[in-house]
């Protein structure tokens, strides 16, 4: 748990070209130099900046308005596409209900996270070892945090209910509005 103000981030990272980078920021520049690739990213008004590197990622993407939504997983299957479609749908619901999403990209990354997920500015983790329906719910909950806890910040130590409660309630509102609750 933490409390953080917003800041502007600029990051450049060089990695072996076989690696894929998933991170909070928007890609600004990519330079391939032999066996290495250098990526540059920016993030305006972020509460934090997170990234995940892997040489095993399969990447799926959709567009929602001005935002590119990415889903990174170790394998692409029918559940991946269902989860991504549902993320896009809830993303649009949250945007119309709670206000415009502030970043150019949003990435959901399956990781070896212990359980559930974790939100960061423009990116969230979901545990890859969950059943598909649990993974989906975690992704929806962490997507809601892009509005509650990220865009609208709070003291996550002394007022944790604010973002957790609003994120959870937002998922229920979305599921109810789409007839899935």
Tell where the protein language model's regions lie, with residue ranges.
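Hydrophobic helix-coil surface modules that form long, contiguous segments used
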Residues: 2-140, 169
């Amino acid at each position: 748990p933490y409390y953080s103000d917003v800041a502007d981030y600029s990051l450049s990272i060089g990695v072996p070209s076989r690696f894929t980078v998933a991170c909070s920021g928007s890609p600004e520049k990519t330079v391939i130099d032999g066996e290495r690739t250098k990526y540059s990213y920016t993030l305006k008004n972020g509460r934090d900046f997170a990234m995940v590197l892997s040489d095993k990622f399969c990447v799926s993407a959709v567009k929602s308005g001005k935002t590119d939504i990415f889903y990174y997983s170790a394998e692409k299957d029918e559940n991946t596409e269902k989860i991504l479609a549902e993320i896009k749908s809830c993303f649009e619901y949250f945007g119309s209900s709670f206000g415009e999403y502030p970043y150019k990209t949003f990435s959901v990354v399956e990781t070896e996270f212990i359980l559930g997920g974790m939100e960061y500015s423009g990116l969230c983790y979901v545990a890859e070892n969950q059943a598909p329906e649990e993974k989906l719910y975690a992704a929806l909950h962490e997507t809601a945090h892009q509005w509650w806890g990220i865009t609208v910040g709070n003291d996550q130590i002394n007022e944790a209910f604010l973002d957790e409660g609003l994120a959870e309630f937002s998922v229920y509102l979305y599921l109810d509005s789409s007839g899935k609750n």
